[in-house]
């Protein structure tokens, strides 16, 4: 089985465009320049579009001061894990789902999570940066997302091709969701 690499995903995206492939990340070509420019954004967007099994994490959250103005809705504030890309669910005592929202801390330096859970377990998508951790289906979806972002600068705003690429990406999401979801069976939550 071929090891997933950043260059392999870049070249797959370039192939979707019908563009020239590249041999190294630091090439001084329009294709390599655009791939470097859009790579992180495409990766984060594709990770946020679905809770991919390989990127799911759980963490007990560390409490921080509740910002003023939220006392009527929430009782507790928590710092998010460092690599948290998207929060999916907060569970009180690790079991019962609780409503939550994200807000800025009073200094405006970080995003915090507000909830009524006194002991909060967060289910979240981690910002996975290393290609060797990606599964094949995600790598394919990421290449499609990257192709969507590369289309305008490399194809000189060919609107028809851009729309086609975005449609292919969107149409592939349900299949990816079905395939990825078939690999997990969550435990039922206890009756309250």
Please tell me what each predicted stretch does.
Residues 33-106, 134-150, 154:
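Divalent metal-cofactor coordination and adjacent catalytic microenvironments
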Residues 20, 85-89, 111-113:
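Generic detector of short, locally flexible boundary/turn motifs and exposed helical patches
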Residues 13, 17-21, 46, 50, ...:
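A generic secondary-structure signal for well-formed alpha-helical elements
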Residues 1-37, 192:
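Short, extreme N-terminal leader segments that mark the start of a protein/domain
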Residues 25, 54-60, 187-189:
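Short coil/turn segments at secondary-structure boundaries
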């Amino acid at each position: 089985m071929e090891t997933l690499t950043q260059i392999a995903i870049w070249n797959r995206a370039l192939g979707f465009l019908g563009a020239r492939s590249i041999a190294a990340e630091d090439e001084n070509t329009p294709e390599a320049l655009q791939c470097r420019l859009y790579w992180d954004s495409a990766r984060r967007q594709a990770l946020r579009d679905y809770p991919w099994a390989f990127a799911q994490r759980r963490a007990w959250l560390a409490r921080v001061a509740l910002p003023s103005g939220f006392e009527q809705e929430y009782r507790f504030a928590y710092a998010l894990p460092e690599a948290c890309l998207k929060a999916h669910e907060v569970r009180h005592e690790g079991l019962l789902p609780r409503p939550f929202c994200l807000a800025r801390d009073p200094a405006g330096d970080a995003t915090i999570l507000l909830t009524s859970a006194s002991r909060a377990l967060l289910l979240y998508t981690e910002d996975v940066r290393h290609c060797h951790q990606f599964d094949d289906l995600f790598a394919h979806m990421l290449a499609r997302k990257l192709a969507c972002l590369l289309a305008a600068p490399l194809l000189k705003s060919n609107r028809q091709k851009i729309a086609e690429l975005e449609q292919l990406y969107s149409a592939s999401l349900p299949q990816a969701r079905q395939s990825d979801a078939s690999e997990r069976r969550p435990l039922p939550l206890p009756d309250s």
